[in-house]
Amino acid sequence: MSGSGTVAPVYDFKVLYVKLSKDFRVIVIEKLGYGYSDICDFVSDVDTLVSIQKRALEKLGENGPYILMPHSMSGIEALRWMQLYPDDVKALIGNDMTTPLTYSIWTKEKVEKKIKLMNFATKYKLYWLLCPISNRCLTGEEKKQHKMLRKRNAFNICHINESKAILDNVAIVESQGYKKCPALIFKSNGKQTAGHWSECQKEFASILNAKLISYDCGHYIHHYKSNEMCKEIIKFVDLLII
């Protein structure tokens, strides 16, 4: 599950899922406005986001329970999935994920500033600067596709609507509390995220009694530590099936 503005999840996460796919069936979700999915103007409330993903998986013949692995902002969607469809979630693996705790200091003004920056970047075509992409593990054609999708998807209306809805979505999740399940949390060094991000993940891991693994690297942990993550995920899942 990709975070806000990841222009091509199928390519961004490839460096990790090609390793995991040797042992597991892995599905990369590309939400509306992401990757090769359609771009459309729709209300991005968290219940709609989650239900669309659930229906898409079911149409593919994929049924839970799933092990959800959200990156960044999609942590809110994963937590809502656990609330709405608890039988669908076997476990949670957080990839520098957000929780309601992360947004505790966010204000409407902060969200508005983010949206203004997105609109500014769109107007002046600054996607190459504000949406850096990783070419790790990609073929020549995939690198071209990744750049094409960045140009197509960066700061589109779906991303803007998600940002507009984030505080309301957080409030919905927060109001219903955290559902307990087996959890593994990967945490970055926090240098590319808000100052309190790391502490929030520590607190969240404590609430879920989750194993917390910290890496001295940037927010897109899978770009830097895919080998280490893969080993830890295999150990974690092995314990689930014992």
Predicted regions and their residues:
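Active-site loop/oxyanion-hole signature of alpha/beta-hydrolase fold enzymes
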Residues: 28-69, 85
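Residue in the alpha/beta-hydrolase core beta-strand immediately N-terminal to the catalytic nucleophile
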Residues: 66-67, 91-93
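Conserved HGGG/HGGXW glycine-rich cap/lid loop of the alpha/beta-hydrolase fold
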Residues: 1-36
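Conserved serine/cysteine hydrolase catalytic core
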Residues: 139-208, 213-216
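Short helix immediately C-terminal to the catalytic nucleophile in hydrolase catalytic domains
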Residues: 78-82, 94
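Catalytic histidine-centered segment of alpha/beta-hydrolase-like enzymes
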Residues: 217-228
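Gly/Ala-rich beta-loop-alpha elbow adjacent to hydrolase catalytic centers
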Residues: 70-74, 78
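Flexible "cap/lid" loop of the alpha/beta hydrolase fold
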Residues: 93-122
